[in-house]
Amino acid sequence: MSELAYPYEAPASQALFDRAAAVTPGGVNSPVRAFRAVGGTPRFMVSGTGPYLTDADGREYVDLVCSWGPMILGHAHPEVIAAVQEAVARGTSFGTPAEGEVALAEAMVERVAPLEEVRLVSSGTEATMSAIRLARGFTRRTKVIKFAGCYHGHVDSLLAAAGSGVATFALPDTPGVTGAQASDTIVLPYNDLDAVHAAFAAHPGEIACVITEASPGNMGVVPPLPGFNQGLKDACAANGALFVSDEVMTGFRTSLAGWFGVEGVVPDLMTFGKVMGGGFPAAAFGGRADVMAHLAPAGPVYQAGTLSGNPVATAAGLAQLRLLDDAAYDTVDAVSAQIQALVTEALTKEGVAHTLQNASNMFSVFFTDRPVVNYEDAKAQESFRFTAFFHSLLANGVYLPPSSFESWFVSTAHDERAVQRIADALPAAARAAAEATA
């Protein structure tokens, strides 16, 4: 397109942002939504249908965020909506056990072999926080190994050198996390097994677990090198620690069994969120039955939540999981591959140095000509080119994550019309990236 599809101004969104800023810190309820990394007015959305979002100014966008991953069937899928409406009519929360939470747990255990038992919670942060507590309680050890650029929610002990919004805002750490909490976290370079072995040697009998994103998407998409996750599993087994695989992003997104289904490495504990909630606040952690047996009320490690296993959230999640068959993943993978090819073609034609990386249907573009294998590589890209690329696409009706440190997502609803709109918008975006200056 030679002209912008929409005026750049977004007055209705700006008015809402001004209202929000008066009552909410930074005007948003999750930092990356504020557009601080790219500038401009955050778009306030009023509806979503299939692969499209509509903002407060009435503009329609092809959505490549998909609510940061959960909307793998697209927005407002009729069968998910029907399940939610039916559940709401029965009541929104009971504070008791309910069949829906059992059915969702059964569906997860059926799909993911390492899940022998699972506990439902309400957010990915709760899931990773609880998994870490359980690992410490089971091993009676305190230290945790994590990797720079991997994000595991805003758990105090796991915010050191984290990805996602922490990477977007270039925060090395965050006030409010005490030195004592941070001292029990060992942060290592991602994809570096030698560093892992050295950490175990330096802290014999002290490390409770190693936690990693199964395939990271919070510093952009940086897949594990061949053998890395298996090496983590082996190192943990040799040293009496637990291997915790964070599948909040990849779970039920990268395959029917998440990243485990792609790679086959068996963790001791796993965490889930996003897709399993069908767009509602739902998450989980689970794994080996002997480890999960230490969780209250069966064991001494306490964890609880008023809205855990919420009947509306479990109805949405169960409906979505039941629709995710092999054909659905074939569709998502094919759409993702098609868009990746279009992005590569457009940037190559304009001579823009870039590296496109994917983990199954998750993908992102780094504005560098070098492979990205860790957080330092991700930070070395020319992010100013992403800013120009982002705003050109936004103005032409394509909504990307407003940060160069995030994964892009697609859905089964991204049809030929949606892909064509992306194709039409990419040449101008590639030119904008080529012409951008720091």
Swiss-Prot record:
Pathway given in the UniProt record:
Porphyrin-containing compound metabolism; protoporphyrin-IX biosynthesis; 5-aminolevulinate from L-glutamyl-tRNA(Glu): step 2/2
**Isomerase in keyword set:** yes
Name its cellular compartments.
Answer: Cytoplasm
Name the domain of life.
Bacteria
Q: Could you name the Gene Ontology cellular component terms for this entry?
A: cytoplasm
**Which reactions are catalysed by this chain?**
(S)-4-amino-5-oxopentanoate = 5-aminolevulinate
Q: Which UniProt keywords apply?
A: Cytoplasm, Isomerase, Porphyrin biosynthesis, Pyridoxal phosphate
Cleaved signal peptide residues? none
InterPro entries in UniProt: 4pyrrol_synth_GluAld_NH2Trfase, Aminotrans_3, Aminotrans_3_PPA_site, PyrdxlP-dep_Trfase, PyrdxlP-dep_Trfase_major, PyrdxlP-dep_Trfase_small
For this protein, the record's Pfam families field holds:
Aminotran_3
Where is it mostly found? cytoplasm
* N6-(pyridoxal phosphate)lysine PTM sites in chain numbering: 274
**Listed cofactors:** pyridoxal 5'-phosphate
Instruction: Please verify whether the record's keywords include Cytoplasm.
Output: yes
A Gene Ontology annotation in the biological process aspect, one of them, is: protoporphyrinogen IX biosynthetic process
Task: Report the GO molecular function annotations.
Answer: glutamate-1-semialdehyde 2,1-aminomutase activity; pyridoxal phosphate binding; transaminase activity
State the EC number(s).
Answer: 5.4.3.8
- Annotated family: Belongs to the class-III pyridoxal-phosphate-dependent aminotransferase family. HemL subfamily.
- Subunit composition and interactions: Homodimer.
Q: What is this protein called?
A: Glutamate-1-semialdehyde 2,1-aminomutase
Query: What species is this protein from?
Result: Streptomyces coelicolor (strain ATCC BAA-471 / A3(2) / M145)
